[in-house]
């Protein structure tokens, strides 16, 4: 079995009727495929949108609401209804499911990140299928485009999945918008996610949910940089999930980095909040980015910000202004300032094990398009 542990992300458009309401037949089809894969020995996680779609009708809205408060209220009602649909269908096959609601804070806070990882590991080891969604009833910023796309990639990276599958109404990444450009061709295999790929993604995608192709590609960067390959395919086939697991479904496959980031490095790269900035000279910049060395105090030109021992800072090349990466400091700002002022600073500010270099691919995640 090539892909033992698989994370599936199902978008709103793959779960709803034409009027935007939840399609119980589509949910049933998804759970049947999950059951078949589970019985075949796969470990599965489902990141599911659809809470708003499941709840807005029950609150008397005639169509999917657009105001944040109305969305949150609909999600609060719909989350339970959606989970009930999944749970009922899976129990018919004697499969236990578990609801997990996450927010970005669960990834930013290292303690909560570790707790979430441990809970998911126990569930998978006990044969349950975790069903995950953004906690839409309490968050605001996370309701923006791409919430569950990014969430699924973060979860896949956290549990070191063997594959992340995006099920959507577009069967992969195209060179243009396939709905308006007859010359658009699907890319079947993407080795590296670069600016060209990002530009292609900006012109294609679904308009029904809160996710689009661009957010899926940026989410795929998180997964592939963490060693998890990604597959984007259509959910329109009745056996699309099974075909994706067997690599027989038409779609776009994103190759994972051979040496993916492990949990500690993932946290540093994608979630750790920087508390200050450090500028270094040319020699220190080369030592960090080219030779995998620790950051010595002797290479620091200046520091900015209020940070303490153990905090995360961003390091810049003073000459070029380029961001080199992030790391955990061994000294607070005040102590560092005193040592730099003495002009005889010796020792290490950031050890290599507490450092992550920002690659061009990772940098794209923090670029507005």
Curated annotation (Swiss-Prot):
Substrate binds at residues 49, 136, 148. InterPro entries: AceGlu_kinase-like_sf, Asp/Glu/Uridylate_kinase, G5K_ProB, Glu/AcGlu_kinase, Glu_5kinase, Glu_5kinase/COase_Synthase, Glutamate_5-kinase_CS, PUA. The keyword Kinase applies. It is an enzyme of class 2 (transferase). Pathway: Amino-acid biosynthesis; L-proline biosynthesis; L-glutamate 5-semialdehyde from L-glutamate: step 1/2. The keyword Kinase applies. Gene3D superfamilies: Acetylglutamate kinase-like (3.40.1160.10), PUA domain (2.30.130.10). Keywords: Amino-acid biosynthesis, ATP-binding, Cytoplasm, Kinase, Nucleotide-binding, Proline biosynthesis, Transferase. GO terms for biological process: L-proline biosynthetic process. One of its GO terms (molecular function) is glutamate 5-kinase activity. Catalyzes the transfer of a phosphate group to glutamate to form L-glutamate 5-phosphate. This is Glutamate 5-kinase. The gene is proB.
